[in-house]
UniProtKB/Swiss-Prot annotation:
Main localization category: nucleus
Alphabetic keyword roster: Activator, DNA-binding, Nucleus, Repeat, Transcription, Transcription regulation
Protein's name in the database: Transcription factor MYB1
Role, per record: Activates DODA1 and CYP76AD1 in the betalain red pigment pathway.
Organism whose genome encodes this protein: Beta vulgaris (Sugar beet)
Length: 224
């Protein structure tokens, strides 16, 4: 009360919680002058409160006809119906519910209806989690662009290895050839070398100068 009297002497409006003495002054004013004309209530009641604060205190806390407790089923249906039509205009909705305050209607919608609506709209969690995990771990084949093309020198190595294997097989099978043929040059001895040189000509990245150097080799000495 000391704070309120000091604020009144200085002409300031008091904010914050109401005291018991202020509640009594507001009750007496409403009983004498009735509800309405809230602009003159602070002056008539001798309160350093704004008209909005006086109206809010009376309608939500001090009015004798206020009904406390849980909302029944009919009241809940009515609130839902009116909220679809009026939106968040709580004062209009509460005015149509006898004994219910604006605060009670607003708090009920915020704590019950909105919460229930948000829970119902939450999507159900996925049940087949193993399928999701295994599908994400499946290795994907590499694209055709990522497959490495063999280079020209790799082709040469493969060709040389193949010819080396063919030469070994010919040496193993040549143990039974006639003794008279020793020392004679096989006319087809250079077929493998010709085939190898032809493969080199087909490689686009092989330089022309290097190909001529290969052709200058002594073919007979190379295969001797």
């Amino acid at each position: 009360m000391y704070q309120n009297s000091e604020a009144g002497s200085l002409g300031r409006v008091v904010k914050g919680s109401w005291s018991d003495e202020e509640d009594d002054l507001l009750r007496k004013c409403i009983q004498k002058y009735g509800e309405g004309n809230w602009k003159r209530v602070p002056e008539r009641a001798g309160l350093n409160r704004c008209r909005k604060s006086c109206r809010w205190r009376w309608l939500n806390y001090l009015k004798p006809s206020i009904k406390r407790g849980h909302f029944n089923e009919d009241e809940v249906k009515f609130i839902i119906q009116q909220h679809k039509l009026l939106g968040n205009r709580w004062s209009l909705i509460a005015a149509k519910l006898p004994g219910r305050t604006i605060n009670d209607v607003k708090n009920y919608c915020n704590t019950h209806l909105y919460k229930k609506h948000s829970i119902e709209n939450i999507p159900a969690p996925a049940t087949n989690t193993m399928t999701h995990n295994t599908s994400s771990c499946v290795e994907r084949p590499e694209s055709s662009a990522a497959i490495k093309e063999p280079t020209w020198w790799e082709n040469i190595l493969v060709e040389l290895q193949r010819e080396e294997k063919e030469g070994k097989s010919q040496n193993c099978s040549g143990l039974d050839f006639e003794q008279d043929n020793l020392g004679q040059q096989d006319p087809n001895i250079n077929d493998g070398m010709d085939q190898w040189l032809n493969s080199l000509r087909e490689v686009p990245n092989l330089s022309y100068q290097w190909e001529e150097n290969l052709l200058d080799f002594d073919v007979v000495n190379l295969w001797a």
